[in-house]
């Protein structure tokens, strides 16, 4: 669910992340559904919004003449029994010293606003229903039906309060008090704070790290353990452009990032569990895909909705064609994920090791082929350096696990292939004239994926060849305030895109490896300042306006915070320790 500062829930998919949106007015103000609560008189109104400390419970305060006149507290019930789904939204409305007229407006628009519901008044509220879906609103306020929505303008007395509850998948309603919303609120508060207390991190930028961890946690679909890259679809990478994608899937290359990040701050159980859940899905399908659905629905068909788009950005897409691409780096990602899981305390059993050996056999065959690589180019496949390096990194992880764990493996053969890949990249993927690695064989261009080379261990960060590469990336792809574009290459799509936030975190990791800690800290603080009022990030940012671009909130951006803050803390502590020796 996304709750805008004007009191509108303007995006929400129920009962699951990948279900057709019920609330989608962020993509089409006229057609899309919404659930709004706000002061009727919005003149001279200031709005503040924040999370209750160490929770994902959202508070929105409407302020006039310096005083809070109305507060809403929004949450979806959660508890330690996370596999039980609560497709409900509870909204607590309270006034303070003055009477306030409020507007409540409720319009679920099922199946991306393509199905017109039957609206029935029932005791305690209204129920909206189609052939397959039902959703109700329970409230003490007297709502009225008007065409495709129900609403009320209500005069609330000073220091009064009430609950308004939206429930998906129901056939009848109870009184609002019967839903025990206050008890659900306390349970949800306790759940989030208990989860947050399991973190072992207390270092630099602790509040941002924990907000990112909480944001990441809410992107998990508990019944299967899968995580969406973002809970939204078709929020544009450029206003008015066509780069509008559906991110409500699990990307296999994100797996290693998730495991490493969660384990870094103490969530080893979640890290190991995520890998096992991911492996369970892969084993059932007996193949590796670029992306996976969170509930095994396998609905990847990319299609366009008849929506106006966010700020006129069309087409509005759901589904994702990336599932059909060959992205060789994903094989390296899953092997590195298993290695990360092992370092986090997980067990590499015989089943997992058999899987690793199968992956190494595939990489041995595939690494020489062109692919679409990490940026999922929709143009002709090429020999991307990043995919070669990820193949090298897979062999590095497999060899290390075999040696450390005493596992049977053709280590000599693997080392020979690893060396072959390294020599191939150094011969065809490095340009002596510019003293830099290049995006793909035969190219003169750099791309930001090359920032990962030292992080993956392919080349030391202080090697002159990487320093030359980093200099070119700074000169050609850094745009403003430590923000980076992915590449300058024609990718077959019209229009421009914003700066990818994850790239800044890769850059910071490189600076840490170079022991340029002051520069790393400056870059991290710069990116922290770019978070929104809730401490959240999208995928990209418009470097000119500071506006967020792309889907939101974006897992990789928050994984970046979780990864680099502890690394920077550790590097500073090591420096202090050396000084004190």
Swiss-Prot record:
Superkingdom of this protein's organism: Archaea
GO BP annotation list: trehalose catabolic process
Coiled coil: none
Enzymatic class: hydrolase
InterPro entries according to UniProt: 6-hairpin_glycosidase_sf, 6hp_glycosidase-like_sf, GH15-like, Trehalase-like_N
Record-level Gene Ontology MF annotations: alpha,alpha-trehalase activity
Annotated EC: 3.2.1.28
Reported temperature dependence: Optimum temperature is 50 degrees Celsius.
Catalysed transformations (reactions): alpha,alpha-trehalose + H2O = alpha-D-glucose + beta-D-glucose
Regulation: Inhibited by validamycin A.
Biophysicochemical property: pH dependence: Optimum pH is 3.7. Active within a narrow range of acidic pH values (pH 3.2 to 3.9).
Pathway(s) the chain acts in: Glycan degradation; trehalose degradation; D-glucose from alpha,alpha-trehalose: step 1/1
Record function comment: Catalyzes the hydrolysis of alpha,alpha-trehalose into two molecules of D-glucose.
PANTHER family attached to this UniProt entry: GLUCAN 1,4-ALPHA-GLUCOSIDASE (PTHR31616:SF0), TREHALASE (PTHR31616)
Sequence similarity: Belongs to the glycosyl hydrolase 15 family.
Quaternary data: Monomer.
Protein name per Swiss-Prot or TrEMBL: Trehalase
């Amino acid at each position: 669910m996304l709750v805008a500062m004007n009191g509108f829930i303007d995006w929400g998919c129920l009962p699951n992340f990948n279900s057709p949106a019920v609330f989608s007015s962020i993509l089409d103000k006229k057609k899309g559904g919404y659930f709004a609560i706000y002061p009727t008189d919005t003149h001279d109104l200031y709005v503040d919004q924040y999370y209750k400390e160490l929770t994902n419970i959202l508070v929105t305060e409407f302020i006039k003449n310096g005083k809070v006149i109305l507060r809403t507290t929004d949450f979806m019930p959660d508890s330690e029994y996370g596999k039980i789904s609560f497709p409900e939204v509870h909204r607590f409305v309270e006034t303070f010293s003055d009477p306030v007229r409020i507007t409540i407006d409720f319009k679920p628009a099922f199946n991306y606003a393509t199905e017109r519901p039957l609206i029935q008044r029932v005791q305690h509220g209204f129920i909206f229903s189609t052939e397959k879906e039902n959703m109700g609103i329970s409230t003490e306020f007297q709502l009225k039906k008007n065409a495709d929505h129900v609403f009320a303008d209500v005069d609330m007395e000073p220091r009064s309060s009430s609950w308004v509850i939206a429930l998906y998948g129901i056939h009848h309603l109870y009184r609002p008090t019967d839903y025990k919303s206050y008890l659900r609120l306390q349970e949800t508060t306790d759940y989030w704070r208990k989860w947050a207390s399991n973190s072992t991190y207390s270092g630099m930028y602790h509040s941002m790290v924990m907000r990112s961890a909480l944001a990441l946690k809410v992107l998990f679909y508990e019944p299967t353990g899968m995580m969406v890259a973002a809970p939204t679809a078709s929020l544009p990478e450029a206003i008015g452009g066509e780069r509008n994608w559906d991110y409500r899937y699990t990307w296999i290359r994100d797996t290693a990032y998730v495991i490493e990040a969660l384990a870094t701050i103490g969530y080893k159980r979640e890290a190991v569990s995520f890998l096992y859940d991911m492996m369970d899905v892969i084993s059932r399908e007996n193949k590796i895909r670029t992306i996976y659905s969170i509930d095994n629905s396998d609905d990847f068909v990319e299609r366009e909705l008849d929506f106006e788009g966010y700020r006129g950005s069309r087409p509005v897409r759901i589904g994702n064609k990336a599932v059909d691409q060959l992205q060789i780096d994903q094989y390296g990602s899953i092997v590195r994920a298993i290695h990360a899981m092992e370092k986090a305390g997980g067990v590499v059993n015989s089943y997992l090791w058999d899987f690793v050996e199968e992956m190494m056999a595939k990489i041995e065959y595939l690494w020489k082929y062109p692919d679409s690589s990490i940026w999922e180019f929709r143009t002709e496949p090429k020999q991307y350096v990043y995919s070669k390096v990820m193949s090298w990194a897979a062999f590095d992880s497999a060899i290390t696990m075999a040696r450390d764990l005493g596992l049977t493996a053709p280590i000599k053969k693997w080392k020979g292939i690893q060396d072959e890949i390294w020599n191939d990249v150094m011969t065809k993927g490095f340009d002596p004239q510019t003293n830099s690695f290049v995006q793909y064989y035969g190219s003169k261009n750099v791309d930001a994926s090359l920032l990962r080379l030292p992080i993956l261990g392919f080349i030391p960060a202080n090697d002159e060849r990487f320093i030359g590469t980093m200099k070119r990336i700074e000169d050609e792809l850094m745009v403003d305030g430590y923000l980076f574009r992915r590449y300058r290459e024609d990718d077959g799509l019209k229009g421009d895109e914003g700066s990818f936030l994850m790239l800044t975190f890769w850059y910071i990791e490189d600076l840490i490896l170079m022991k340029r800690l002051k520069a790393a800290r400056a870059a991290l603080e710069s990116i922290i300042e770019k978070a929104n009022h809730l401490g959240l990030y999208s995928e990209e940012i418009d470097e000119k306006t500071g506006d967020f671009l792309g889907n939101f909130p974006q897992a990789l951006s928050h994984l970046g915070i979780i990864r680099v803050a502890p690394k920077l803390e550790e590097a500073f502590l090591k420096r202090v320790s050396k000084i004190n020796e």
